[in-house]
From Swiss-Prot:
UniProt keyword terms in alphabetical order: Metal-binding, Ribonucleoprotein, Ribosomal protein, RNA-binding, rRNA-binding, Zinc
GO biological process, one term: translation
UniProt-listed HAMAP family: Ribosomal_bL31_1
Protein name: Large ribosomal subunit protein bL31
The organism's place on the tree of life at top rank: Bacteria
Function: Binds the 23S rRNA.
Gene: rpmE
Self-association and partners: Part of the 50S ribosomal subunit.
Similarity remark: Belongs to the bacterial ribosomal protein bL31 family. Type A subfamily.
Family annotation (Pfam families): Ribosomal_L31
InterPro entries, per database record: Ribosomal_bL28/bL31-like_sf, Ribosomal_bL31, Ribosomal_bL31_A, Ribosomal_bL31_sf
Binding sites annotated in the UniProt record for Zn(2+): C16, C18, C37, C40
Length: 70
């Protein structure tokens, strides 16, 4: 590998919405905020969870006249 052309590889923190904190390394120097991780993803937990970012589910239901389940 050529010397001096590669970005620095630094430690960052990825924080999930469930509170799980993951330390990893990346060339991106800012910390990440995750919506789902291995601790709260429905595939791994077996529980269904609706992740609504900005009312998109309600907007979809309203557009297609689908009654709300709440």
């Amino acid at each position: 590998m050529k010397q001096g052309i590669h970005p620095e590889y630094k430690e960052i923190t990825a924080t999930c919405s469930c509170g799980n904190v993951i330390k990893t390394r990346s060339t991106v120097e800012k910390n990440l905020n995750l919506d789902v991780c291995g601790n709260c993803h429905p595939f791994y937990t077996g529980k269904q969870r609706v992740v609504d970012t900005g009312g998109r589910v309600e907007r979809f239901n309203k557009r297609f006249n689908i009654p709300s389940t709440k």
